[in-house]
Curated annotation (Swiss-Prot):
Residues 6-256 form the ABC transporter domain. GO terms for biological process: amino acid transport; peptide transport; transmembrane transport. It is a peripheral membrane protein. This is Probable peptide ABC transporter ATP-binding protein y4tS. SUPFAM superfamilies: P-loop containing nucleoside triphosphate hydrolases (SSF52540). Its main location: membrane.
Amino acid sequence: MSDALLKVESLTKHYPIEAGWFKTNVPVVRAVEDVSFTVQAGETLCVVGESGCGKSTLARLLMRLIDPTSGRVLVEGTDIAGLRKNELRAWRRRMQMVFQDPYSSLNPRLTAGQIITEPVENFECLSRRQRQELATDLLRKVGMSPEMASRYPSEMSGGQRQRLGIARALALKPSLIIADEAVSALDVSVQAQILNLLMDLQQETGIALIFISHDLAVVEHIGHRVAVMYLGRIVELSPRDALFAKPVHPYTEALIAAAPVPDPARARLEVPLEGEVPSPVNPPSGCAFHPRCPLAVDRCRAEVPPLVPMPDGRAVACHVRAPAAAAHISPSALASLALPKTVQPGGTILARR
């Protein structure tokens, strides 16, 4: 098995809430808590969960747009979480991000060509001809006409803007692209086009993708592995096919059961799930899911379940479904759980299910 492109170990992010004159005993928002995983070159890891579970915060931590409270983010063996700003600059080329909102993530004062070439010009001096060739090549690569290079974002549709965002991310030839809800603001037909584009680009260039989404139908098509987050923690990390065929964690079961099934002849899994996601400021003791879990036992209320490996290659944090009788697992070993032996991208998406 090849070395991982990205390795995340015990990544944590707390936001202190300032209160009172002396700011003593300041409560914190536990946005991301002890997250570990690995991503290989050419792999797509999907991160799913309800709103507020920490998905977008995780994406910003991986990009070092915000600093972690603790933990490590290793890109090709280098911990970028500990780098100074001047040292981090060189690593920006290896990781790029496609943001959720295609309307506010593009500079309205720049043309499409300028938006694409701006990241490269931060590192290299380009002639006018080189800028034109780069913009034309990347616009074609994302399925847009070269004539669009002279247009402004306000003259484009949402799908065209998202394609432009992808072209900008590809300009620096990164090894990893993080897509944070990159298709959620688009209509269904445009979603399929963007997803097909990402998968085609991955097959052509071998880039790794971290795809953040709440749409399980999209995840089932584009992902190789899936990390399910709940209240800042990963509760299940699994190969895609195993996760959708037989989810193990009760929360994963509930998510899949809640997804609409267009086939009336297909039986739906009924999983009772009551209540709302607890506050990350005052999370429940033990397993954060226990107030909503139909399987909760006394141990769930007292101890935080570790993410432990299962015989089928997945990892689950559940005292009932995956009792942790084994010794403590190091963050480094935990990050490598459920790694696929080979990466085989999924097929072309014709339409959303």
